[in-house]
């Protein structure tokens, strides 16, 4: 039996952010998230502009931008997201108690809850992290916000698997409107209980198998066939000798072709 399409899932999903994302993916024919780990605002905005037509989402590590300012970095980034129709995912990986993450998410210099449609968290401190982040989002903005839980990682020797992953899924189940999916390596189940998890997978490459710092790459086709909804690609799009627009379309097409295969009868 073929998997349900993004548009079918968008119509019924309990999370406003997931509905928006799945509909946008269907509209742009893209399940590609660009991971833009660059260290200046100029590089960030230029790279996003080149990749924008091919992606459904941009994933940032905003704290590595050395010349960050809200007005100079975030405001133009949000404008690009609106203009080119993609969501913003700040890969913050929150991992503290609820009261602390509430301040980290809403406050400080980055004010993540104000602008990032999506963020993520580890389950190591328990379900309080979900409640704290949701409260911060509700107190900060009327725009929909969504959380991904880190269930599995793509790096060599990662300890996020087995029992840890199972417990993280249980934490995710505590709020299906706010927690809409996982960073994971494939399908996370839950359909028989009424959950429709959106799975996003890093460590996806068409050419490389890994790097010297422990990253392990899997092919686009492999991850999509095992249940991944969004492929997260970084250096494959803009590494040395690569042209972002060319690679953006290449990965977009590979991701969409793999998805089409998955939903075809």
UniProtKB/Swiss-Prot annotation:
Its EC number is 4.1.1.23. CDD domains: OMP_decarboxylase_like. Disulfide bonds: none annotated. The keyword Lyase applies. InterPro entries: Aldolase_TIM, OMPdecase, OMPdecase_AS, OMPdeCOase_dom, RibuloseP-bd_barrel. The keyword Transferase does not apply. It comes from the Eukaryota. Substrate binds at residues 37, 59-61, 91-100, 217, 235. It is an enzyme of class 4 (lyase). Keywords: Decarboxylase, Lyase, Pyrimidine biosynthesis. GO terms for cellular component: cytosol. SMART domains: OMPdecase (SM00934). The active site is at 93 (proton donor). GO terms for molecular function: orotidine-5'-phosphate decarboxylase activity. It catalyses: orotidine 5'-phosphate + H(+) = UMP + CO2. Pathway: Pyrimidine metabolism; UMP biosynthesis via de novo pathway; UMP from orotate: step 2/2. GO terms for biological process: 'de novo' pyrimidine nucleobase biosynthetic process; 'de novo' UMP biosynthetic process. Belongs to the OMP decarboxylase family. This is Orotidine 5'-phosphate decarboxylase. It comes from Diutina rugosa (Yeast).
């Amino acid at each position: 039996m073929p998997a349900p399409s993004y548009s079918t899932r968008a119509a019924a999903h309990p999370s406003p952010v997931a509905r928006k994302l799945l509909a946008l993916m269907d509209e742009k024919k893209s399940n590609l998230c660009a991971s833009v780990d660059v260290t200046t605002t100029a590089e960030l905005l230029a790279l996003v502009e080149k990749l924008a037509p091919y992606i459904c989402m941009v994933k940032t590590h905003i704290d590595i931008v050395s010349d960050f300012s809200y007005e100079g970095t975030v405001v133009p980034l949000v404008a690009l997201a609106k203009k080119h129709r993609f969501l913003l995912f700040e890969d913050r990986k929150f991992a503290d108690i609820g009261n602390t993450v509430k301040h980290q998410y809403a406050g400080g210099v980055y004010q993540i809850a104000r602008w990032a449609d999506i963020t993520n968290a580890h389950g190591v401190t328990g379900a309080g992290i979900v409640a704290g982040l949701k409260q911060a989002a509700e107190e900060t903005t009327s725009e929909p916000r969504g959380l991904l839980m880190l269930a599995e990682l793509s790096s060599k020797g990662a300890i996020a698997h087995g029992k840890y992953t199972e417990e993280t899924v249980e934490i995710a189940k505590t709020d299906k409107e706010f927690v809409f999916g996982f960073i994971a390596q494939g399908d996370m189940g839950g359909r028989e209980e009424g959950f429709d998890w959106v799975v996003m997978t890093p460590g996806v490459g068409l050419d490389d198998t890994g790097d010297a710092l422990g990253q392990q790459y899997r092919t686009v086709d492999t991850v999509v066939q095992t249940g991944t909804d969004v492929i997260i690609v970084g250096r494959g799009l803009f590494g040395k000798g690569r042209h972002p627009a060319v690679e953006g379309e290449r990965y977009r097409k590979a991701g969409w072709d793999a998805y089409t295969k998955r939903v075809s009868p």
